[in-house]
Regions:
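Second RecA-like catalytic domain
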Residues: 1-201
Length: 201
């Protein structure tokens, strides 16, 4: 609404007005993402750019920060992954087998890097497939949902097209751990937690 220069959301004549709490939460999120400076305030340059992306504001902010931090190639993979249901399947009757199969994708430092490992593994499998039937069989043997992997690729393709329309370029060199996580945190500030490594007795 801000980007369209419409009246303040609190005064707009909605058929069914949103709850005041929802409006407050929305403004708080935009402030967190640096899209506005204050509740009811005008869009910042960051906010104006985010308004051009028909995406969840958090995802849009991650992608924008990734373009600035030379991490867009990696964040496209992660943003599309967290937009769908996890493709890793964990059937109740085969949880140990699924965990063992998924171990090859695990990264000790970051769950986000695990998603990149999984993406690279699936892309390699697709590039070297002998047939679609054998490829799908390989995915199922590794407890991966064929349907969700397809959704992941579709969302990735859509996000990549959007970023190209924005004029953002993919980084040619792999992003560092710091570049990647700095970009991701731009959209996840409200989700940060602190781990206390000292046991409390």
């Amino acid at each position: 609404m801000k980007s369209l220069h419409l009246t303040d959301v609190r005064e707009f004549p909605f058929v069914q007005a949103p709850l005041q709490r929802a409006i407050t939460d929305g403004y708080d999120l935009l402030i967190e993402l640096n899209a506005v400076k204050e509740r009811g305030g005008e869009l910042t340059p960051v906010g104006k750019e985010l308004a051009r992306l028909p995406l969840d504001a958090r995802l849009a902010r991650m992608l924008q920060a990734a373009a600035e931090n030379q991490a867009l190639a990696e964040v496209l993979i992660i943003a599309s992954a967290i937009s769908i249901q996890d493709p890793r399947e964990r059937p109740l009757d085969a949880q140990d087998k699924a965990a063992a199969a998924h171990k090859k994708f695990a990264d000790e430092k970051s769950d986000f890097l695990s998603l990149i490992k999984l993406w690279n593994w699936t892309q390699d499998a697709i590039a070297n497939k002998e047939s679609n039937r054998l490829l799908e069989q390989k995915f199922r043997q590794n407890y991966l949902s064929v349907k969700r992997l397809r959704e992941w690729r579709d969302v990735y393709r859509q996000l990549k097209e959007l970023t190209q329309e924005m004029g953002w370029r993919l980084n040619t060199a792999p992003a560092t751990y710091e570049q990647l996580h700095k970009a991701l945190l731009s959209g996840l500030l409200g989700n940060i937690g602190m781990k206390d490594v000292q046991a409390d007795y």
